[in-house]
Amino acid sequence: MKLSRRSFMKANAVAAAAAAAGLSVPGVARAVVGQQEAIKWDKAPCRFCGTGCGVLVGTQQGRVVACQGDPDAPVNRGLNCIKGYFLPKIMYGKDRLTQPLLRMKNGKYDKEGEFTLITWDQAFDVMEEKFKTALKEKGPESIGMFGSGQWTIWEGYAASKLFKAGFRSNNIDPNARHCMASAVVGFMRTFGMDEPMGCYDDIEQADAFVLWGANMAEMHPILWSRITNRRLSNQNVTVAVLSTYQHRSFELADNGIIFTPQSDLVILNYIANYIIQNNAINQDFFSKHVNLRKGATDIGYGLRPTHPLEKAAKNPGSDASEPMSFEDYKAFVAEYTLEKTAEMTGVPKDQLEQLAQLYADPNKKVISYWTMGFNQHTRGVWANNLVYNLHLLTGKISQPGCGPFSLTGQPSACGTAREVGTFAHRLPADMVVTNEKHRDICEKKWNIPSGTIPAKIGLHAVAQDRALKDGKLNVYWTMCTNNMQAGPNINEERMPGWRDPRNFIIVSDPYPTVSALAADLILPTAMWVEKEGAYGNAERRTQFWRQQVQAPGEAKSDLWQLVQFSRRFKTEEVWPEDLLAKKPELRGKTLYEVLYATPEVSKFPVSELAEDQLNDESRELGFYLQKGLFEEYAWFGRGHGHDLAPFDDYHKARGLRWPVVNGKETQWRYSEGNDPYVKAGEGYKFYGKPDGKAVIFALPFEPAAEAPDEEYDLWLSTGRVLEHWHTGSMTRRVPELHRAFPEAVLFIHPLDAKARDLRRGDKVKVVSRRGEVISIVETRGRNRPPQGLVYMPFFDAAQLVNKLTLDATDPLSKETDFKKCAVKLEKV
């Protein structure tokens, strides 16, 4: 669109006047720009992190041409972060995939062949053959899927149905296993229900913010802007930031704490001890609403059973616990004295006391925020449990301005991975595959034979890598994720399985990522507003958007791929005879007919869409697929504390926070007057537990799986930077973001660099026991590691830092610890 200088100035003047009058800028744009087709604006949640910012998307002539913060969005109130402003450009990279690609030689599939353009029918032909062969020869455990916290809600639901009900395989897991699994298990252990009890409105009412392993200034910048506003507007507000290295969030900190890796467990127990020793327990809350339990210890590190660390563990993978008295709990935390804590953590005593006083002060409303520093941790579940302890001891929970809050990193890690239940052990609404009653509920709702869903937990993310390497998992489909770059221990545990000739790997992606280029078949995927979608953010807010443009070429949404592929299988090909005998009416039907084109899902006509409304999947099928899938899925949570609103309500609103009961969303769960599931007179009720009480756990410090030694003498921590998101497969295709941070660097303390004869800008080889990468020395800038630790982001495909990382996981959540392994440096 071209504008004369006069028109441009006129547009700016009108926009400024409109802003002053409180009018929306898109309306002004339509009024001013008359030379060509006007830009059409519609709402959508941002494509990036779990904050869930609302944006206005401008489309013209079939392309997304503009994006701005939505002033009516309650999350961001019209403000975007730097990534959000460049959303249109993520869709139009020069190497966007538009047609399926198969490795071929001499006209047919070959594992060592070159990628060759094929049709969708050809792609599904080879997929069908590979899936059916694996199912026939080795059974459902030989196939698997790795999905995403970036799936829309109905994409995740469709995938879970296809694998768990259709193929009878629980080998489906999301990449949220790498980021949110510890939070999930922590919530379930303490409260019996997943996801935070508070919301973002807490920010404007809190007196203190404590960040545990969360660089919100770069990873959740819009929320950080709200915290900054609260801190700078009120001199009595305090910010404490804890990390293993100094980062941009420290710029606002009143108490910036650098601790030795893994010793956050010590600090958490010290604060609990401080609260007890200073008689700061909220006795009324504690006596009515809390139970105490002692957890199993020495639980291993989630490595292969043959690993020496696993052999040495007394209780590998144990989630066991037993009741304990308050006196026993008091004695347990009493060992974590101020002196011992300062010694183990390297944190000055006065800083530790200042931190503990925030929680102990009955007049201070405290919010605890955390992300990957807690979750990507070999004791991540414990860390989650221990921070809940502090809020439960003091009663600072489920009320405006105070509570524990786990922040998510992906746009629908909550709404899709967690709530839908795309983990290998989960079903919708916090149900699990190991519970016969839960399986029965799903099987009846889905009208499939009893016993269809396997009771055995499937392979989690890291276990999938190991099974591929071992030749046990032979057909593997990944969607909306770049795990060859993002997952741990690439050299030893991932690449061997992907390139094993016994295995067939399918990657659905918009771009030729590291994962796509390591696959055998690449399926081009529609992204963001090229499809109708729904995400669920960190504060339980479910948000919808409409399809606003069509995908380029033959790119198709993940939902289309799943549903169309299901047509290739009849029930007799995937279910044993004893199951078919229970529902003989399903014989001869395709999985498409059994799972998707059912009376329950297909009852909403496509005529519910406006005539000019894009919806490629529904118009092709002849019914409103997204609405049918959502309403079927939402049934599982309604009446059980996971209530979602009717489908149409979300297109009208800027998101709603569940539980949504009688048209009203819930800001604070578990407290009387805020949560519709808490009756008058109950005060608080943690209704995920049978007795309505939350659990305080006694859990000790246990060391990291791998620490520096004489040879590998530095800690390595990995993470992100503001300008790029995860592996950079979208943001590195935005020229402005790429120029702002073009390549990964190794952040290192100047004295550590000097001791190794390294200077800023030097090339350096970073070496672990598993691999090596070459990076660039950075002794200045935004991240300032202490001596003994280096930090490296993972967005750069040319510097695969996960060649270095260890595939140790939290044994309870199976989430990888990307924050702690040992490396050495060699000058290049």
UniProtKB/Swiss-Prot annotation:
Binding site for [4Fe-4S] cluster: 46, 49, 53, 81
Catalysed reaction equations from the record: 2 Fe(II)-[cytochrome] + nitrate + 2 H(+) = 2 Fe(III)-[cytochrome] + nitrite + H2O
Main location: periplasm
UniProt key word Transferase: no
Entry's Gene Ontology cellular component terms: membrane; nitrate reductase complex; periplasmic space
Listed EC numbers: 1.9.6.1
Residues the record lists as binding substrate: 794
Pfam families: Molybdop_Fe4S4, Molybdopterin, Molydop_binding
One GO process term, biological-process aspect: Mo-molybdopterin cofactor biosynthetic process
Cell compartments where the protein resides: Periplasm
Family matches, as InterPro entries: Asp_de-COase-like_dom_sf, CT_Nitrate-R-NapA-like, MoPterin_dinucl-bd_dom, Mopterin_OxRdtase, Mopterin_OxRdtase_4Fe-4S_dom, MopterinOxRdtase_cofactor_BS, Periplasm_NO3_reductase_lsu, Prok_molybdopt-oxidoreductase
Signal peptide positions (record): 1-31
Enzyme class name: oxidoreductase
Molecular function in Gene Ontology: 4 iron, 4 sulfur cluster binding; electron transfer activity; iron ion binding; molybdenum ion binding; molybdopterin cofactor binding; nitrate reductase (cytochrome) activity
Binding sites annotated in the UniProt record for Mo-bis(molybdopterin guanine dinucleotide): 83, 150, 175, 179, 212-219, 243-247, 262-264, 372, 376, 482, 508-509, 531, 558, 718-727, 802, 819
Span of domain 4Fe-4S Mo/W bis-MGD-type: 39-95
Gene3D superfamilies reported for this sequence: 2.40.40.20, 3.30.200.210, 3.40.50.740, Dimethylsulfoxide Reductase, domain 2
Keywords: 4Fe-4S, Electron transport, Iron, Iron-sulfur, Metal-binding, Molybdenum, Nitrate assimilation, Oxidoreductase, Periplasm, Signal, Transport
Cofactor(s) listed in the protein's UniProt record: [4Fe-4S] cluster; Mo-bis(molybdopterin guanine dinucleotide)
HAMAP family: Nitrate_reduct_NapA
Family classification: Belongs to the prokaryotic molybdopterin-containing oxidoreductase family. NasA/NapA/NarB subfamily.
Function: Catalytic subunit of the periplasmic nitrate reductase complex NapAB. Receives electrons from NapB and catalyzes the reduction of nitrate to nitrite.
Assembly and interaction partners: Component of the periplasmic nitrate reductase NapAB complex composed of NapA and NapB.
Official protein name in the record: Periplasmic nitrate reductase
Encoding gene (name): napA
